[in-house]
A protein has these predicted regions:
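C-terminal helical cap and adjacent loop that interface with cofactors, partners, or active-site loops
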Residues: 225, 235-249
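N-terminal Rossmann-like dinucleotide-binding module
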Residues: 1-19
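Hydrophobic residues in well-ordered beta-strands that form the structural core
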Residues: 63-64, 88-90, 219
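Contiguous beta-strand/loop segments that form the cofactor/metal-binding neighborhood of enzyme cores
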Residues: 155-228
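Predominantly a Rossmann-like dinucleotide-binding segment in NAD(P)-dependent oxidoreductases
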Residues: 94-167
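Receiver (REC) domain switch-region micro-motif
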Residues: 2, 38, 116
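Beta-loop-alpha module in the N-terminal Rossmann-like domain of NAD(P)-dependent dehydrogenases
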Residues: 14, 19-80
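Rossmann-fold dehydrogenase core element
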Residues: 75-93, 112-115
Length: 249
């Protein structure tokens, strides 16, 4: 079953026809009566609200990133899911990809980690409209838009999944009309620093590098794809891996 806004009903009808979806509605509560699992692809600000309603109805929930806008909201949803004995997932698959697991496996071979850098920058198709005075949802501070929530969350998950929670975090955003159109997040660990960059106002090739005393690991695709990985030892030949099947290099 599919639930959409009234405005998006024509598009929803096309999706139902294309994928053989038997039921469509614009009423979220009606949808909850038809399904066992909910996948939420609504604006960031609405994630908490819709997820909570579904969990309270005893439904399993998959939420687009970010799961919620605050840590407190996320913790509340997790507690509710445990109480209702249902599953709650953030729809971010990086940590389950084979290439990502290979990176984790390679970490001991680069020695002591010293620097980590991640760059996920892509010029948004909506940035021109934003510059012209419009306020697309992805650039609306009242809808929890911006580069941190939209793109840098991938980098954060990538880093934290490998190294755990940092000791300190600092965010340096480029602000336009109250929203971060790009920014740099620094994460401080006991013996190394991580830099996480993301931009919606400019583009650059994706680059993920983990530098250690005995070599470095390089990946040239965004965290959500986690494509081909290359291990560059200080001594010896480089090694290339791509274990994700059909995903891009």
């Amino acid at each position: 079953a599919l639930c959409s806004t009234q405005r998006s009903a024509p598009v929803a009808d096309e999706m139902c026809e294309q994928y053989g979806i038997p039921q469509r509605t614009t009423n979220y509560f009606e949808l909850l009566q038809w399904v066992d699992v909910i996948y939420l692809a609504v604006p960031n600000l609405q994630h908490y609200r819709y997820a909570k309603v579904a969990l309270e109805a005893g439904k399993h929930v998959i939420v687009e990133k970010p799961m919620a806008c605050t840590a407190a909201q996320t913790e509340e949803l997790a507690a509710l899911a445990r109480r209702k004995k249902v599953f709650l997932f953030e729809a971010m698959t990086t940590q389950y990809l084979e290439n990502y697991n290979k990176i984790r496996e390679l970490l001991p071979r680069i020695g002591r980690v010293k620097l980590v850098q991640c760059n996920f920058s892509q010029y948004s198709s909506r940035y021109d409209a934003f510059c012209a005075g419009e306020t697309p949802v992805s650039f609306d501070p009242e809808c929890a838009g911006g580069a941190l929530m939209d793109l840098n969350v991938y980098n954060i998950s990538y880093i934290v999944g490998l190294f755990g929670e940092p000791n300190q975090v600092h965010y340096l955003p480029n602000m336009e009309r109250g929203i971060d159109t790009s920014g740099i997040l620094t994460m401080e660990y006991n013996s190394f620093k991580a830099v996480s960059m993301a931009a919606k106002d400019c583009g650059a090739p994706a680059r993920y590098v983990i530098q250690g005393t005995k070599g470095y690991i390089l990946q040239k695709s965004t965290a959500n794809w986690c494509g081909g990985v290359t291990f560059h030892p200080n001594q010896g030949k480089e090694e290339h891996f791509n274990l994700n099947g059909g995903r891009p290099q």
